[in-house]
Amino acid sequence: MKKDTTPKFHKLHVKTGDTVQIIAGKDKGKVGEVIKALPQLSKVVVKGVNIKTKQIIAGKDKGKVGEVIKALPQLSKVVVKGVNIKTKHVKPQQEGESGRIVTQEAPIHSSNVMLYSTKQNVASRVCYTFTAEGKKVRKLKKTGEILDN
């Protein structure tokens, strides 16, 4: 039997620009901003520390908090600012030009990040509620803080 290679789309609980905390992996405990979300891979790319809010819950960056820079819902991944940094060796493009080493944020699976409240410095799960006007918004379960304006 062949494996099903079609990508599975997962609903991500984080969006680009959210602040998250890493809850697993080598960056556990870091806080950063989500740069990019990869829903197909169920991963996120996180950037920076103590900027917005998402907490990483697994992996080498476990515990780090950062802002979600990019959400990739087709891959179920996100990119968080300053978290899961990888080095890439780039060959020279032209003769006489030297090669270089570039550092960039790699995607993290969305299940390894939690939304983070910068006001109360606590990571929390998300629930959905409706405002008085009938608009559906995201809310942190622990703090009751509304995320979407």
Swiss-Prot record:
InterPro entries: KOW, Rib_uL2_dom2, Ribosomal_uL24, Ribosomal_uL24_CS, Ribosomal_uL24_KOW, Translation_prot_SH3-like_sf. Part of the 50S ribosomal subunit. Pfam families: KOW (PF00467), ribosomal_L24 (PF17136). GO terms for cellular component: ribonucleoprotein complex; ribosome. This is Large ribosomal subunit protein uL24. One of two assembly initiator proteins, it binds directly to the 5'-end of the 23S rRNA, where it nucleates assembly of the 50S subunit. Gene3D superfamilies: 2.30.30.30. GO terms for molecular function: rRNA binding; structural constituent of ribosome. The gene is rplX. It comes from the Bacteria. Belongs to the universal ribosomal protein uL24 family. GO terms for biological process: translation. Coiled coil: none annotated. Keywords: Ribonucleoprotein, Ribosomal protein, RNA-binding, rRNA-binding.
